[in-house]
């Protein structure tokens, strides 16, 4: 089984497959080609058909900045997955030096094809929950101990970063007003809901409003392309 790092990821909304995945792919490519003159990205399948609404081109352009990037939107899907794209890299002579095929396969996970293809490392010997529960019972350990037994030494620090990102998205969403970007112009309500909770006397109603305001805060941050 893969590391829990593959489950918990920090990225931008509104979609793990249409923004978080493409952002991770762009970051990886930029690390390999920091001196590129420009990039051109062919968005295929679902990334092309719904990419504008999901801010796919926006997050790729933001990630590659200040290096310029242009886009082609192609409705045909690539062979492996509906969320595919091809990134063309151009050197300082404006000659294409590489074309990288990459897929955003869900949950922020990405898959490169060809010589950049990598598979997540297996860090757990057990393959399913039944095997895990049997193992922890035999060893007399908790699930938390089981995780620490298998993950690397920096995993607890990683979890604190994830927790901090969760709190930050709530706090950020509670501070903002106005409308969410996009044609629907949906009004943000988390801040007003939080203020309503503060002024509610009945404890059960107050707690329900607080919880709802936190949920709306994260949802609105996600929809508006914020970090979650």
Model-derived regions: residue spans:
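N-terminal glycine-rich anion-binding loops that anchor highly charged ligand groups
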Residues: 1-3, 33-37
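Generic structural signal for well-ordered, non-membrane alpha-helical segments
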Residues: 19-22, 26, 53-57, 80, ...
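Buried hydrophobic packing segments
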Residues: 22-29, 60, 64, 215-218, ...
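Mobile "lid/hinge" segments at catalytic clefts and subdomain interfaces of large enzymes
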Residues: 44, 55-145
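Accessory "access/gating" subregions that flank catalytic or transport cores
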Residues: 157-228
């Amino acid at each position: 089984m893969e590391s829990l790092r593959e489950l918990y990821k920090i990225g931008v909304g509104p979609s793990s497959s249409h923004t978080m995945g493409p952002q991770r792919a762009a970051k990886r490519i930029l690390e390999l080609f920091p001196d590129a003159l420009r990039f051109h990205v062919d968005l295929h399948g679902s990334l092309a058909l719904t990419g504008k609404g999901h801010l796919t081109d926006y997050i790729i352009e933001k990630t590659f900045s200040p290096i310029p990037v242009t886009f082609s939107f192609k409705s045909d899907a690539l062979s492996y997955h509906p969320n595919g794209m091809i990134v063309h890299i151009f050197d300082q002579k404006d000659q294409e030096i590489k074309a990288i095929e990459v897929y955003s396969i869900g949950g922020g996970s990405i898959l490169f094809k060809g010589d950049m293809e990598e598979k997540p490392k297996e860090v757990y010997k057990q393959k399913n929950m039944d095997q895990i529960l049997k193992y922890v019972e035999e060893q007399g350990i908790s699930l938390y101990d089981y995780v620490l037994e298998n993950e690397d030494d920096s995993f607890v620090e990683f979890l604190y970063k994830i927790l901090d990102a969760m709190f930050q998205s709530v706090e950020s969403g509670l501070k903002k007003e106005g409308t969410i970007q996009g044609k629907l112009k949906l009004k943000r309500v988390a801040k007003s809901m939080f203020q309503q909770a503060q002024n509610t006397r009945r404890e059960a109603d107050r707690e329900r409003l607080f919880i709802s305001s936190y949920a709306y805060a994260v949802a609105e941050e996600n929809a508006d392309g914020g970090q979650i």
